[in-house]
Amino acid sequence: MTFAAIPLLQRSLPETFSDWLSPLLSDRYDPHLVPGNQKRGLLIGMGMTEKQGGSDVLSNTTRAEKSAEGFYHLIGHKWFFSVPQSDAHLVLAQAPAGLSCFFVPRLLPDGQRNGVHLERLKDKLGNRANASSEVEFFNACGWLVGEEGDGVRQILKMGGLTRFDCALGSHALMRRAYSVALYHALQRQAFGKNLVDQPIMRQVLGQMALRLEGQTAFLFRL
């Protein structure tokens, strides 16, 4: 998600966090719990989904109230909060002019923790190593990205690239699985022949290769 957020944040990162751009572009992972401008690399997550609406984000109830200092206070929840260990999240919340996108850091510029409370991690099926959580916002500080009421269009700039990253990840797993299967078939013998020389196994490997090449072509079209 971090790389998917970079094009949006390069154009629309709130001025308060302009010194985050350098670590945002880094390929380093920095686990330290310090403000983003003090890190060698950053993680960026996303918070859209709420329990009452699911994928219908227009029904979100998390609200954002503008403060005298120019940032917003977020009050509400997210049912799925992607990459909860991130240094900041892009979060959808209802502002006076409609659903808007906010940059919500884990730590405030002065180093204090933001009002983002992780409730629990999701017990997911599949990609368990990529954590998701439930979260509550208690007057969490968020900075507007773009304009009020333009939240869906803004966050989908990140969402579209995130889906492309997911497709690349799936393709990588397919290619790895095919490589392992082919290597095994080249080494393993049964009934006096290597498996790769057995007609049925050749058919299975051929089908795997065709599916893999089809997805490769599809990714290049994307």
Label each PLM-derived region with a short phrase:
Residues 1-32, 81-84, 212, 216:
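Internal helix-loop-helix
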Residues 5, 46, 64, 74-76, ...:
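Buried hydrophobic positions in well-ordered alpha/beta secondary-structure cores of metabolic enzymes
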Residues 13-62, 66, 70:
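Internal maturation/activation junctions in enzymes
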Residues 42-48, 73-75, 115-120:
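Short Pro/Gly-enriched beta-strand edge/turn motifs at strand-loop
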Residues 52-55, 80-82, 94, 124-130:
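Short Gly/Pro-enriched turn/cap motifs at secondary-structure boundaries
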Residues 71-115:
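A short core secondary-structure module
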Residues 110-112, 119, 131-162, 179-196:
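A glycine-rich, basic-preceded beta-loop-alpha segment at the flavin cofactor/substrate interface
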Residues 163-222:
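Extended amphipathic alpha-helical segments enriched in small hydrophobics
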